[in-house]
A protein has these predicted regions:
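A Rossmann-like FAD-binding core segment of flavoenzymes
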Residues: 25-27, 69, 75-94, 101, ...
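Mid-to-C-terminal Rossmann-like scaffold of FAD/NAD(P)H-dependent oxidoreductases
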Residues: 1, 8, 12, 280-393, ...
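Glycine-rich dinucleotide-binding loop and its adjacent helix/turn
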Residues: 110-170, 205-206, 263-265, 486-488, ...
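Rossmann-like dinucleotide-binding cores of NAD(P)H-dependent redox enzymes
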Residues: 59, 150-151, 158-214, 296-300, ...
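Rhodanese-like catalytic fold shared by cysteine-dependent sulfurtransferases
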Residues: 413-424, 428-465, 472-503, 512-551
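FAD-site-proximal beta/loop scaffold in flavoenzymes
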Residues: 124-147, 219-223, 228-306, 401, ...
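N-terminal Rossmann-like dinucleotide/flavin-binding domain of flavoprotein oxidoreductases
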Residues: 18-105, 188-205, 341-343, 435, ...
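Beta1-alpha1 glycine-rich phosphate/pyrophosphate-binding loop at the start
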Residues: 1-73, 158, 164-187, 324, ...
Length: 551
């Protein structure tokens, strides 16, 4: 049996090594058009600042090491230029010469390529780079030797955020230009606002709702759509990726969403002898059940292994992807799994949203830091659709737990039952994940009714009254205009100051005390809802709509 794999790195090399473990006598040939068949592409931004201090650490395996350990025939700098499904051959170019190679089964793992927008003057710019492979960062490092002062990062997705952070740590003045209203478009607006604030607190200029319309002076000046000019010694394009499906298209394979390669649940393409994995394929999103493009290393590695099993006659099913991802911006971490509130609306799902604040470990233990979690779930069944987290520490742990819960088809009713490790340095007796479950149960069972931060202005305009139950000292940090104020500790004694004909919205700092106030008021006969996320969340998203004491 002869297996040919086009493309290395995550998907291709996972498949190649798995095939060898399954079939010792098989012939396995890997063609990689670049010079590196196995490298840490997710680590590339951190090499720019020196956080990863040696280039060699980015190179995971070499053709020689793979030949020695797995008896793989790995050929770098070999570009497959055509596939001939009818004869089961591929055409390979190397060193100016072309030849054909036969196969019994073929795996496509071409990955994705950076999306290059059509911008006037881009082709003449001499200082514009992408970050996709080792030669890309080699070119950027060479440019950094010229001691550039100003850098512009176009695009505020994960790669853009990581590159901006590392260029800033390198000592450059960094500006991020993002055409959408927020950074990290894969997060919901209020969660992304924490990352934008962290970038700005570290002197990274962030321009949202803004696009570059032209490069001038060979890329040293960028014109924005509002007419302003940005000076740039170094520009990074990170406006997303698109499937590198050119070979598949030339071979007549079926393509789908945005040119992604269509595969079945066994990773077979429209040609049964050709399989495909990684960033180039269309997957089924586990929540929406709709086609999706998910360019992440973890799914690509898993897909490579599963495709190898199928190619070797050991059936494995692709169960879909959640798109679980994480990014660091200086001292803050953001992570997500499943779908966002925005995606739930677009998919037409019935859903409920809640936010829960906590600490990464027991609050009384030293160095506890704030943690904010968001949950999207079905308002009746409690099915978990997605989750997001923001904080300095512990975000990865909580989102990993919630991603596992979704994969295991747990509901919000199961979250309080999770027995998670606890000691004061590591967590809390009621972990924030447990608390998400408790809060969601209260909502589903009718003990609590919530409104979201973006609904507050309209609710107030319709006559509802906001009641702030924080302490007087907390008001010195900011307060809602026209809100009533009764500290929670005084609420029971001051119920006669409230009007049972008036509908109330209660708020505190993060949501716990306002829930307690909600329960007190409801049982006293008042109509009341709880502002989800409370003052702290609203302040993060719309600080200009709040009042602050003078001085």
């Amino acid at each position: 049996m002869k297996f040919v794999i086009i493309g290395g790195v995550a998907g291709g090399m996972s498949a190649a090594t798995r095939l060898r473990r399954l079939q010792e006598d098989a012939e396995i040939v890997v063609f990689e058009k670049g010079p590196n068949v196995s490298f840490a592409n997710c680590g590339l931004p951190y090499y720019l600042s020196g956080e990863i201090d040696e280039r060699e650490k980015l190179l995971i395996q070499t053709p020689e090491s793979l030949a020695a350990r797995f008896r793989l025939d790995v050929r770098v700098d070999h570009e497959v230029t055509a596939i001939f499904p009818e004869t089961k051959e591929v055409e390979v170019s190397h060193g100016g010469e072309s030849r054909k190679e036969t196969y019994d089964a073929l795996l496509l793992s071409p990955g994705a390529k950076p999306f290059i927008p059509e911008i006037t003057g881009l082709s003449e710019a001499k200082n514009v780079f992408t970050v996709r492979n080792v030669p890309d960062v080699d070119a950027i490092m060479e440019k950094l030797e010229e001691q550039p002062r100003k850098a512009v990062v176009i695009g505020a997705g994960f790669i853009g955020i990581e590159v901006a952070e590392n260029l800033k740590k390198r000592g450059l003045d960094v500006t991020i230009v993002e055409r959408t209203p927020q950074v990290v478009p894969t997060l919901d607006e209020e969660m992304a606002s924490f990352i934008q604030k962290e970038l700005e607190n570290n002197d990274v200029q962030v321009l949202t709702n803004c696009a570059v319309t032209s490069f001038e002076e060979q890329g040293n000046m960028l014109r924005l759509e509002n007419g302003e000019m940005l000076e740039s010694d170094l520009t990074i394009l990170s406006v997303g990726v698109q499937p590198d499906s050119r070979l598949a298209e030339m071979a007549g394979l079926t393509l789908g969403l945005r040119g992604g390669i269509v595969v079945d649940e066994h990773y077979q393409t429209s040609d049964p002898a050709i399989f495909a994995v990684g960033d180039a394929i269309v997957v089924k999103h586990q929540i929406t059940k709709k086609p999706a493009l998910i360019s992440l290393a973890s799914p690509a590695n898993r897909q490579g292994r599963q495709a190898a099993d199928n190619m070797a006659g050991r059936p494995r099913l692709n169960q879909g992807s959640l798109g679980t991802a994480i990014v660091r911006a200086f001292g803050q971490t953001a992570a997500s799994t499943g779908i966002t509130e925005r995606q739930a609306k677009k998919a037409g799902l019935s859903f409920q949203v809640l936010h829960a604040s906590g600490k990464d470990h027991a609050g009384y233990y030293p160095s506890a830091t704030d943690l904010l979690l968001k949950l999207i779930f079905h308002p009746e069944t409690g099915e978990i659709y997605g989750a997001q987290g923001i904080g300095q520490k512990g975000v990865d742990k909580r989102i990993d737990i919630l991603a596992t819960a979704i994969k295991g088809h747990l509901t919000v009713f199961d979250l309080p039952e999770l027995e998670l490790t606890y000691a004061p340095p590591f967590g809390s007796a009621k972990d924030p994940v447990n608390m998400l479950g408790y809060i969601a149960m209260n909502v589903i069972e009718g003990l609590s009714e919530m409104i979201q931060w973006h609904e507050l202005p309209e609710e107030l305009a319709h006559g509802k009254q906001l009641l702030d139950v924080r302490n007087k000292e907390e008001l010195q940090k900011g307060y809602f205009p026209k809100a009533s104020h009764i500290p929670l500790s005084e609420l029971r004694q001051r119920l006669d100051e409230l009007d049972k004909e008036q509908e109330y919205i209660v708020s505190c700092h993060s949501g716990l005390r306002s829930y307690l106030a909600e329960r007190i008021l409801k049982q006293a006969g008042f109509t009341v809802k709880n502002l989800d996320g409370a003052f702290s969340l609203y302040q993060a998203v719309r600080p200009d709509e709040l009042c602050y004491p003078q001085g």
